[in-house]
Amino acid sequence: MNSKDYNVYIDEAGDEGLNKGSKYFILTAIIVPKNKDLEISKEVDCIKNNLEIDIKKQLHWNSIKGFPNKLMIMEKIGSLDIKIVNVIIDTKSIKLIPSNNIYLFFSGYLFERITWIMKENNGKANILISSRGNLSKNNLINYINHHNHSKFEIDSSLIKDIKIIPNERKKLLQLSDCCCSSLFQSLKYNNNTHFEYINKIKSNI
C-alpha cells in the first residue's frame, strides 16, 4: 500500500530561558494531509479577510486584538481536517538541561509523536519548522538521530524532509503559531475565558 504524504508545521511559544524565561515553553505541530494543504491554506486567507488583514501579511496571534476575534480563529481551526500535537514544558521544573538545549531535547518528544501518527496512518511527513535564531537543520537532525536509540522512539524512515522556514512565508506555519500561542495564553492566564480557545480545537488534539 502506498504511503500518504502529510505536511507538518511546527512553531513554538514562550521562552525557554531557565529562571528568567516564561513558566511554560510549548512546541506545537499541526499535521495536514498534503493533498489538502492548499485548501486549508486558503482558510487562513478567510481568517485574514474576516479580520480585515491583507492576505499578504502575516497572521500573528499576539497581534490579534479582542477575545471574539481570537475565538473566531480557533473556531475556524477546529473545523479543519488537521491534527494538533503539543509538547508543554514547565521550565521551572527543569534542573539538568541547559536552556540552550531545551528546544532540541523536547523536539525529540514532538518528532516521536509525529512519527507515531505517521505510522498509524501509513503516512510520511514533510516537516516545516518556523525559523528561530539558533536553530540549525543539521543540528536538529543529528541530535534526533544520535539520541534516537536511548530517549525517543522516532522512526526516521517516516520523515521525508525537514525544512526551516520563516513563519511569514507559510500560511500554515502562521496557523501553527495560533494553535501554540493560544495554548500558551490559556496556561498563562489559567481561566475559563482563555481555556475557551482550547475547547474550540479539542477534537483536533
What are these regions (language model features)?
Residues M1-I205:
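Phosphate-ester processing/binding pockets and catalytic centers
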